Amino acid sequence: MKGFTATLFLWTLIFPSCSGGGGGKAWPTHVVCSDSGLEVLYQSCDPLQDFGFSVEKCSKQLKSNINIRFGIILREDIKELFLDLALMSQGSSVLNFSYPICEAALPKFSFCGRRKGEQIYYAGPVNNPEFTIPQGEYQVLLELYTEKRSTVACANATIMCS
């Protein structure tokens, strides 16, 4: 059954127009987590490809190490990889953040250096500042891109905390 699920997942990523993701249709909205007054949703904003992302434990109190899962098939080689994050609340910018994930001289993850067509699957801890998510609704734009500014993954996320 795992083989069938993996095949179906790969088919969806490789042929989005056959699975409802291409041809001008939006990708589905995915639930990252939903628990105890916190709900995090995302939708791929890359017209060509969706990806998988989840968080192990959903909590308003963000810990310094959270375990995530991320999976995607690469359309570009990764020599260098960067993350841009923009956080908005009520139409106003709250935070803009850029972070180098893979640098030529300093690869931080095992997937740094992967080639076009290969799969990235990361399951493990991510270091971040520990804080409590304030009550409210937030929009987050996340973009992973290469040194050539080619998009690897893009997501519009919504965080709702009550």
Curated annotation (Swiss-Prot):
Keywords: Disulfide bond, Glycoprotein, Immunity, Inflammatory response, Innate immunity, Secreted, Signal
Known tissue expression: Highly expressed in B-cells, monocytes and tonsil.
CDD domains per UniProt: MD-1_MD-2
GO biological process: inflammatory response; innate immune response; lipopolysaccharide-mediated signaling pathway; positive regulation of lipopolysaccharide-mediated signaling pathway
Sugar-modified residues: N96, N156
Xref: InterPro entries: Ig_E-set, LY86, ML_dom
Gene3D superfamilies listed in its UniProt record: 2.60.40.770
Subcellular localization, as worded in the UniProt entry: Secreted, Extracellular space
SMART domains given in the database record: ML
Induction of its expression: In monocytes, down-regulated by the cell-wall fraction of Mycobacterium bovis (BCG-CWS).
The organism's place on the tree of life at top rank: Eukaryota
GO cellular component terms, A-Z: extracellular region
Pfam assignment, any one: E1_DerP2_DerF2
Signal sequence bounds: 1-20
Disulfide bridges in this chain: C33-C58, C45-C154, C102-C112
Subunit (UniProt): M-shaped tetramer of two CD180-LY86 heterodimers.
Protein's job: May cooperate with CD180 and TLR4 to mediate the innate immune response to bacterial lipopolysaccharide (LPS) and cytokine production. Important for efficient CD180 cell surface expression.
Protein name from the UniProt record: Lymphocyte antigen 86
Origin species: Homo sapiens (Human)
